[in-house]
Amino acid sequence: AKIIPFSGFLMPVQYQGVNAEHLHVRKSVGLFDVSHMGEFFVMGKKSIDLLQHICSNDISKITNGKAQYSCLINENGGIIDDLIIYKFNENKFMLVVNAGNIEKDWNWIKLNNEKFGNKLENKSDNMSLLALQGPNSYDLLQELVDFDVRSLKNYSFLKKDINEFKDVIISTTGYTGSGGFELYCKNKYVSGIWEILFEFGKKFNLKPIGLAARDTLRLEMG
């Protein structure tokens, strides 16, 4: 793999080559390590009030177990970052932000929360994220979980075990436009989940994919 520094992480930009990786995700299945992304938790009775105040989309439209794409905005309505908001319940949300903006986003959310008094947790250094993407991702993940993965609608999520790895957030989100899942887990589980996915992924021709192909895939998706 070709490794480059990015937002304090050493990240794989490509493995066998961007074109080959791009096409492989479109027709089969690929695995991305995107653990550099930031994860914040908002917990409290005024979680929705805070998020309505700082995000551009309507938080009241999200039901439990669903996710919403949105923007974090400043006091003038200008965009600070884009993010995905996951709703566990009325009083608990997870915000997933871009790696290069973690500190800036966190400080802005903290500042705006002062009048709402919710509990905030920055779990960016404690959580890892793998993106399993492509048409074969469904059959591959099905081998490792105890629920029907195709029953999980787009932009939905569950907290489930993947084999012996506990409480993984399995989300039908991703940037590739080829379908698939994002898997949020504790740092101590990520290497084991990576390995078991490749063990079970042999028959599905699973390949590791770099960040360059992630960008070309999402650009092509539009």
Task: State where each predicted segment sits.
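Basic, glycine/lysine-rich polyanion-binding surfaces/domains
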Residues: 1-222
